[in-house]
Amino acid sequence: MIGMGADYSFGYRLDPPRRRERLHVDALTEFVRSQLCNLLDIIVPCNGEAEIKVDGFKFLGPDGGVHGLYADRGHSGERSRDSGGNGSGAGAAYGNLANAALYEPRIDYIARQLRDILDLVDLESDGGPVAIDGFRLKNHEDWASSRVANPSDILLHASSSCDLNCVFCYNRDTIDSLAWRRRSPDEELGELEARLSCYNARAGRGLFPSYGSPYEFLSNPHALRILRELRRKTPAAFRICTNGTRLNESTIAQLEELSPVYLEVSLNSSSPARRAMLMGDNQPGTAIGSLALLRRYGVPYSVTVVLWPVPSLEEALDDLAMTAAYAEDNLAALVQVNLPGYTRRSFPQPPFDTGTVWGRTVDYVRGLRERGACPVVIRPSLYEENVTRDRKNVPEVIGTVVNSPAARCGLERGDVIIAVNGILVANRAQARDLLSILQDNGTGGKTLTVKRGGRLLELEIRPGDRRYPFTPGTGTHLGAVFLGTGFREGNLGRMRDILLARRPREALLLSSTLVKPTLEQMLEENPLYIPGGTKLHIGVPENNSLGGNIILGDLLLVQDFIDFIKRYLGSVNGKIDLILIPSSPFYLSGWGRDLSGRPYLDIEREVKIPVELIECDPMWD
């Protein structure tokens, strides 16, 4: 790529110096206080290996008194969140500082420090003051790190535009940290060149992410050029989400040349009229017809349907059946049915009754599975498990990808995996892990022991026995499909380690509506994970920040945790010694921050009770 991004600038806006509202405040003390607070949002001080909690400071000079860091400062995580103007990066091609606070908070730290400095001093050039309204990163390589999970993440930085207008689009009115400033294709290409120049696929090293909530990558006219350049860097599979509007034969043929490529096609309906109604697609035939072309060129894909209940729920379900059948006829790997979600920002009033729509959709999809060979999965899968299964976390197969090793060995819907190659399976997460090991390293015949209708059967599975649409580069778990990832028992082991180290009498574990039933079952079956002398309470915060019908725990914000804990403490007269929170709501950042870019450390600062994170992966499906 010409230039390889050397001239691309990652720049960020600074607001003008603030007017001091509280004249009685000691400006220099406030300056140091703010500088320390900024720093303590990105580091944890240590003495040797021991972490140190800092809540104040004192000067070495005449004023030797102790100054508190967080007293009377409101929501400490919101102290300087306005350092980037409106946060969206609008105007003059500035980046989104709210997004930087999420993905690379050292940039936000620089902005906050500069703003504090410019509140006190003017910078000069040639003897005169200089008005500073922004800054840019100097050496791109200085900002490279080992946080690039997969090459597909790089593509999302060229996804600020979309050519459709879906009624259920979650990008409308999203929070500042995930909001996109729509950019020209050439500007996106410049950023991609910079990112590719710093990308080391073997080391998993590259520039910090900043894609927020992406739109449609293939709408960028440089998309195929970008893919070709990325393919020179890595042989890894490209997973691309697309609305299908650009999937003509020429594009699909070029994607096949770049294999392995896997497409998640947001089709939503095989009916031209319904697709046009839901997505604003003036040429729905392109996306609908792309499924046959993908099959012809051997590009594996799945179909996504958001079950939006218009004009009625029954009509939406009938259309789902036709769409699933159409996907199966064209050898889709699977059909993913997303239970419709919305936030308070996008729909101030509920557009439908969630309990009715979600429950009826689950029942309908279970019936579809009995009639077709293509797996149909519900997202979030834990909802289906909670309303249809008494036993949670069972390694039950709900389908197999057509022509996959799992399908060709005779594995059937309803089978429960008991052992993989002689290794006993305790839960769903373990079954998936063992199947992944076989897929990555297996040769020749292996054995699956399954329970089917009360009988134990032994199946011989051959990892190499597969045809389209299953490919080892894009398929998972040898083609077996489950009710989601499952709960890892190791999470409870890490919780026990914390409880043993802390020895609280009363601990509060915060969970989610979806995970709590599985968590309670596992603790009931394994009570030794709670040490003697500790009483464990389980609470479920509501997502008041996003509102709507959002119940995924990983979408909770720091303020949701704070609000719930304060209410809970009021109900138990403050008798809690330790608060435990899964780390997954802060996973995306990599810096212990929620989706708004606020550090989880603010929870303890606000509620004045020790908070520990239980390290765990998100339970993505």
Where does each model-flagged region fall?
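Conserved C-terminal portion of the radical SAM core fold
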Residues: 202-209, 285-379
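Canonical Radical SAM [4Fe-4S] cluster-binding loop centered on the CxxxCxxC motif
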Residues: 127-131, 141-187
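PDZ/PDZ-like domain segments forming the peptide/carboxylate-binding groove
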Residues: 382-419, 423-426
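Core AdoMet radical
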Residues: 153, 173-187, 199-220, 227-248, ...
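Cofactor-cradling patches in redox/metallo enzymes
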Residues: 541-602
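Structural motif
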Residues: 242-243, 509-515, 582-585, 589, ...
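PDZ-domain C-terminal substructure recognizer with occasional recognition of PDZ-binding tails
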Residues: 364-373, 379, 383-387, 433-475
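Redox- and metal-dependent alpha/beta enzyme cores, enriched for Fe-S-associated oxidoreductases
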Residues: 495-558, 562
